[in-house]
Amino acid sequence: MIPPEANAAFVADMEDVLEVYQRPHDPQRPLVCIDESSKQLIAETRTPLPAKPGQPARHDYEYERNGVANLFMMFAPLEGWRCVTVTDRHTAIDYAHVLRELSDTHCPNAVKIVLVQDNLNIHKPASLYEAFPAPEARRLVERFEWHYTPKHGSWLDMAESELGVLASQCLDRRIADKQILAREVTAWQDHRNKHHAKANWQFTTDEARVKLKRLYPQFE
């Protein structure tokens, strides 16, 4: 939710992210957005009836809950690739391992990875120190240029939009367990990556200063 009144902290973080989004693509400094979501795992207790002409597939109202899985979305909007990592939990340790995967597997040749994410409490360099010895934690901290969306401004994180695409195209049905979820998400991810699906961010700082003028402190 966008704040209803002037909020200097919000506009400062918003303009920081918008400045990042206005930069030209630099392969040595790739832009990567990160966000998380969860998926309730639900198994069918009876075999669903398949769809027929004029009639959708039917599922029994009884089902079995199999817990919740977490999904970390890494999205490079200017390069058109994404990677979704499925985990059992959503902790500082899980987050730290995702960042190491991003650094060493997906962007090993980058001089610096420009990282945009929301202000969740685990999205901090401290998480790396919880997960790894200090020299490794420091190495990883310095691999990133850290940027945060403002509080109540997660819509500025392009990974959130990509999670919405994942939810509508892949997760809008019952999925029984983590293994099936990981398989389905990987298939979706590979299809999107094959087509280099990018994000074309349009909202700029100049537009924000007009359309969201009420959020800016006013001066005589």
Per-region residue spans from a language model:
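C-terminal domain-tail junction helix/linker
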Residues: 3-9, 45, 180-220
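Extended, low-complexity cationic-aromatic segments
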Residues: 13-100, 212
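Mobile genetic element proteins and their domesticated derivatives, centered on retroelements
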Residues: 33-35, 74, 80, 99, ...
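A short acidic (Asp/Glu
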Residues: 42-44, 124-129
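RNase H-like polynucleotidyl transferase catalytic core
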Residues: 58-64, 136-158, 173-176
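Active-site proximal helix-loop segment of RNase H-like, two-metal nucleases, encompassing DDE(D)
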Residues: 82, 151, 159-178, 191-195
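Short, basic/hydrophobic alpha-helical segments
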Residues: 93-114
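Acidic/histidine-rich, metal-coordinating catalytic segments
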Residues: 110-124
